[in-house]
Every structure is written in structure tokens, then in C-alpha cells.
Amino acid sequence: MVGLEKNDPLMLARQLPIKSVALILAGGRGTRLKDLTNKRAKPAVHFGGKFRIIDFALSNCINSGIRRIGVITQYQSHTLVQHIQRGWSFFNEEMNEFVDLLPAQQRMKGENWYRGTADAVTQNLDIIRRYKAEYVVILAGDHIYKQDYSRMLIDHVEKGARCTVACMPVPIQEASAFGVMAVDQDEKIIEFVEKPANPPSMPNDPTRSLASMGIYVFDADYLYELLEEDDNDENSSHDFGKDIIPKITQAGMAYAHPFPLSCVQSDPDSEPYWRDVGTLEAYWKANLDLASVVPELDMYDQHWPIRTYNESLPPAKFVQDRSGSHGMTLNSLVSGGCVISGSVVVQSVLFSRVRVNSFCNIDSAVLLPEVWVGRSCRLRRCVIDRACVIPEGMVIGENAEEDARRFYRSEEGIVLVTREMLRKLGHKQER
């Protein structure tokens, strides 16, 4: 069996995910998304008309054959926990399949909140060891992408690595937000710097840097040993990017895995898709791209479905109002339970149970679930948070000064509207 595994990639693709456990780091606050994450963790933020951001990492695990998953939570975890309990409870424990929720909790040493990404795993080592996995896949729960982790596991084993880091080129002006690495001809990582002020460029491309995606594969025993050493290091910040990966790099045990090798794409000629929707503009832009004629991310790929909690909702409905005006939409995503009455929706994303009343014009907007838009409103280049009631005649996205005074307006001109902001303006939020 061992000999067959070494020579047969198909056998490796089947066996390695079974021998692995995935740990999804889902405790991030996502402060750059402003008020959108005041009451929910970033992985629980809505995306793409019906999903949550964490659904992408979870779906990648399932589609890759990894059915032992731990989700490490911390900040504002209730919404996230509720979503996973409702939408991801189909695993068969008798077949050793599960999604374990691992919240931050008081332990013997007195820690409560996780001190860093590595500490989030360290504090749960007693539970993780019980999984008896040979490989541990560490994932961020707040990125949008499709990846076959079994291909990364194969790469890890074939290179004889103790740690493998997924990477991709990014524009050098954006590289300061990532861990940046240099590799040799065998893709061994020879240098790793976390979020450098002056990121080094790639040898063959001075305009780009080779960035870590925060996706790691470890030999399990090696990871546990590293984490125990790091836990006892008073000078450590207990973070994978700042402490663990540089230490492994110095030991010559870390290898890079180019993301294009495992990125799942319907069109092999397209650019590999991976987004950190950590700012309001990036979030708005990534949502609206899904409504374009040919989106960069294919959500209709039946061979790599993105799963989520599916509510029992009626179909979306477009109706005439009493004046005879038709509800119309163009280049938009409109989810179940929506009703558009005598209004026009263009290049927008409407999540479930959104109601747009008569004489409205919605353009380049993202409306989260249960938003109610009163008559004669104009909404443009905005994100409307869940269950907001937009009063009759309100105009958003046309006057920069007024938008900044009433709501949050980003430097790029994207407006975020929440229930609390509307209440401060004197608008009731109960229908």
C-alpha cells in the first residue's frame, strides 16, 4: 500500500485527505469592513447573494475529500456558530466525519482570548491530537477562492516537506499586507518576511512579490512540536506568519506551493481567483463581479459546488405596481424571497427576502438579507446591511458630502448603511 501511494497520484489524492484534518481560523474581527463586522465575525459576513464567506473554505474541504474539520472561533461568534450548526450538520460521525467548533475559552494557564493565529491552534492542541491526523491543513476562514487541497497535500508529500505554504504573485504595492517569500529552484522557501514595509520583488518580475496566502499544510507531529516550543517562548507573538513560518524557513523545512497548481477553475486560461475581501471596496467589488456577464469566479461549476445553509424560500418575484410600471433587473443576482415591484435593479446583488418597492432605481448596490427599500429611492455604489429599512425617497450614493455625514463613505466612494446609522437619523427600523 505504501509503495502504491508513492507512485500513484490518484491513490494519494484519495488517501491523503482522509489522513488529514483541516483547521479553519475563523475568529477574525475584520475591522477594515467597518460597521459590517460590528455584530458578526468576518467569516460570517454575507457574500454572493446567499453565502457566508466561510462557506468557501468549508466547501473546499468537502470537495477536496477532507471531512474532519475544526473551526476555531473567537470574536462575535454567535452568527457564525448558528450558520455552521444549521448549514453544515450533514456529516456522518459514524464515518469519522465532523465539523468541530473550537471557541476561545478559559484554560489552566489563564489564557482567554487567542494571542495570535498559532496560539489559536495551540490552545486547542488537546482536542486536535485526538483526531490522530497525519497532516494538518491550516486555513483562513475569510477568503474567497476555490482550491483542491488534495493537490496541495500531494505536493507536500512528494517534496518531502514538513511544512508547505500556498503562495501566489501579488502586485508589489500590495505586498506589504502579506507574508512575502523567496524560493529556490526546488520551491524551498529560503526567506520569509511577514508584512514587510519594503517587500522584495520576484527575481523574474520586478512588479510583483511572492505572497503567502495563509494556507498551510503541516506534518501533524512536527506542527505540535513547533507549537509547544512557541508556547513557551516569551518573545513570540504566537503567530504563524510572524513566528512559526520564519522559524521553519530557517530550519530549511518549508516549501512553497504555487496556487495555480491547485486552484479550481472552469476556464484553464483565466487568472487564478483568490480574494481577501477585507475592505469595504474589495467586498463590494467582489460581490458585484459575480453579477457581471462573465464573472472572474464561476459559482455555477457543478463539479466544485459552494455549499451553504439553504432556507425554505419562495422564488424571487418581479411585479407591476399599480401604475403599470414593471419590476426589472439587468446583470444582477436576485435571491429567493425577493420582491421587486415597479423598480429597476442594475448591476446589483440582492440577498434573500429583499423588498424593493415602487419607483426605485438600484444601481451597483449590495443589499444584504431582509433589506426593505421604500418607494422612490435611489441607491448607488453602496452596501446596505441586513434588515435595514430605507425610508421612502432616500437617495444614497449621489452626494459625497451628504453620504459621509449620514453614513460611512470609503475613500473610493462606497457607502455603507446600517440600522444604527439610520436610527441616528431618526428613521424607524421596524416595519
UniProtKB/Swiss-Prot annotation:
Summarizing activity control, the record says: Allosterically activated by fructose-1,6-bisphosphate (F16BP) and inhibited by AMP.
Q: Which residues bind AMP?
A: R40, H46, R52, R130, E370, R386
GO molecular function terms listed in the Swiss-Prot or TrEMBL record: ATP binding; glucose-1-phosphate adenylyltransferase activity
Per UniProt, where does alpha-D-glucose 1-phosphate bind? Y114, G179, E194, K195, S212
The UniProt site entry described as Could play a key role in the communication between the regulatory and the substrate sites is assigned to Q74, W113
Keyword terms, alphabetized: Allosteric enzyme, ATP-binding, Carbohydrate metabolism, Glycogen biosynthesis, Glycogen metabolism, Nucleotide-binding, Nucleotidyltransferase, Transferase
Judging by the UniProt lineage, the source's domain of life is Bacteria
Enzyme Commission number(s) of this protein: 2.7.7.27
Which reaction equation describes what this protein catalyses?
alpha-D-glucose 1-phosphate + ATP + H(+) = ADP-alpha-D-glucose + diphosphate
What are the binding positions for beta-D-fructose 1,6-bisphosphate in this chain?
A: K39, R419, E420, M421, L422, R423, Q429, E430, R431
Pathway connected to this protein: Glycan biosynthesis; glycogen biosynthesis
Q: Which NCBIfam families match?
A: glgC, PRK00725.1, PRK00844.1
Q: Subunit comment for this entry?
A: Homotetramer.
Q: What does this protein do?
A: Involved in the biosynthesis of ADP-glucose, a building block required for the elongation reactions to produce glycogen. Catalyzes the reaction between ATP and alpha-D-glucose 1-phosphate (G1P) to produce pyrophosphate and ADP-Glc.
Family recorded in the similarity comment: Belongs to the bacterial/plant glucose-1-phosphate adenylyltransferase family.
What name has this protein been given in UniProt?
Glucose-1-phosphate adenylyltransferase
